[in-house]
Amino acid sequence: MSCLRQSSQSFYFTQIRWKTVKFKTKIAKTKPLKTPSAQALDHFDFYYGPLFGKKWPSIRLGLLSPNRYLAVMNTMSRNWQAHDEILSDMGAKDLLASIRGKAEDQAIETKRKSVEEKANRETQKVKHEISNPSTSTNTEDSEPDEAIFRSAAGLGEFRASAGELSSGSLQMGLGQSNQNKNVEITGFEGEGVRIPKRDHFFYYPQALHVRSFDRAVLLDFPAPMKDEVGVPSYWLLDGGSLLPVLALGLQKDDSLLDMCAAPGGKSLLAALSNLPSKIVCNDFKLARLGQLKRALMTYVPEDSETIDKFVLKRKDASDVKTWDEFEAYDKVLVDVPCSTDRLSVSTDDGNLFSTGSTQQRLDLPVLQTKILVNALRSVKVGGSVVYSTCTLSPSQNEAVVENAVAVVRNDFGIVTVEESLHQLVSHMTSSGLYRFHDTPLGALVVPFLPSNFGPMYICKLTRLQ
């Protein structure tokens, strides 16, 4: 009897064991891994949700929706004015003309002089505080709310360009004798760094013509039209990409370096302002250089004088040790590689959130810091650098700026000041097309459905010494 009972129990447990194995869920087959775009969205929900709070659902929806464009009129095309009128008849307005207003020419000089006088005083004050850290420390103790470091100042010095660069200086770089040294970037250099800030006066290039539809208008621009020699009369550009070029504050005969120039939209915008005398377009990857060259061949006529302003270079902008262009440019644009948030949630090809690209994505802040360090070394004293990304991530935005400012000060003796973008933000917000999110440094354009631009982060730094 005991043998029968033991056999029955054994048979019973055997049935349960086989039943469990037979119907066990095959996770690998029934639940496939998430796509890179889905992983990116989960990542953004986790990190950006708390950062943006109630704004995040709107920003998230904007990221997942098609972005909107501006039409940049190509004034190098022979019949751009006729096509400009066509877009005007469709209801597209001239964005910069509406911001400038009718009375700008009369008011700009008076305001410029007033702001310049304040800026000269504030610049000397900042330099004095930097050279006398004990004084700065006492001031910080008595005025903890950044009364010194975030005080209103004014426009920086309007300084004329030092002249055109020779081909030799462009090819070989300037002042490379004692600057070639290896710098280790840890990502913590910016802890405790406070960057002086001053107000900045903006004026918008008269030669730039940018068309945009009003907020919430669902019309799309037609395909760009071409003149008789095949040069398009305009091209489409994300509205956020306009701001870094405006933030440069280009002046007549400036020399401009675009450190990560491909695909070339921002360099072309700078050329259309008719202000720079030389535009050096740099990119390290041959494929991107080819893309840049095709853009120039498409939008710049062969017989145009503008084509002579461009110089194409292939240098690794992230190599601090071998970089050899020092104090060579009046303005430097640094549109660095980033996580490209909008593309990350919409496409899987080349997505940095794929498993194989994890380390590349984690290394982005260090790469960006090195590029910005080289940019600050390349700009002349009194010149400006505009840093920009198309991500919402603070670790690729404000943190990179703080780290780079600390590195150039400690390792190269370069002192910088942040230029306030308040005027630019105010003007663009008043157009009804842009929405900004407050940041400790710079300005951040965030997507929103009625006029879906960005994301785009910009920060402007001026070199004092």
From Swiss-Prot:
Annotated region (Disordered), positions in chain: 106-145
Keyword Repeat appears in the UniProt entry = no
**Cellular component aspect of the GO annotation:** mitochondrion
From the UniProt record, list the coiled-coil ranges: none
Enzymatic reactions: a cytidine in rRNA + S-adenosyl-L-methionine = a 5-methylcytidine in rRNA + S-adenosyl-L-homocysteine + H(+); a cytidine in tRNA + S-adenosyl-L-methionine = a 5-methylcytidine in tRNA + S-adenosyl-L-homocysteine + H(+)
Domain of life, per UniProt, equals Eukaryota
Alphabetically, the GO molecular function entries are: RNA binding; rRNA (cytosine-C5-)-methyltransferase activity; tRNA (cytidine-5-)-methyltransferase activity
Q: What happens when the gene is disrupted?
A: RNAi-mediated knockdown does not result in fertility defects.
Which EC number applies?
A: 2.1.1.-
Q: Which residues form the active site?
A: 390 (nucleophile)
Record-linked InterPro entries: MeTrfase_RsmB-F_NOP2_cat, MeTrfase_RsmB-F_NOP2_dom, RCMT, SAM-dependent_MTases_sf
Q: What is its main location?
A: mitochondrion
Q: Does the keyword Transport apply?
A: no
Swiss-Prot/TrEMBL keywords: Methyltransferase, Mitochondrion, RNA-binding, rRNA processing, S-adenosyl-L-methionine, Transferase, Transit peptide, tRNA processing
The Gene Ontology biological process terms listed for this entry are: tRNA processing
Q: Spell out the family assignment given in the record's similarity comment.
A: Belongs to the class I-like SAM-binding methyltransferase superfamily. RsmB/NOP family.
- Write the protein's name: 5-cytosine rRNA methyltransferase nsun-4
Organism, as annotated:
Caenorhabditis elegans
Q: What is the lineage of its organism?
A: Eukaryota, Metazoa, Ecdysozoa, Nematoda, Chromadorea
What gene does this protein come from?
nsun-4
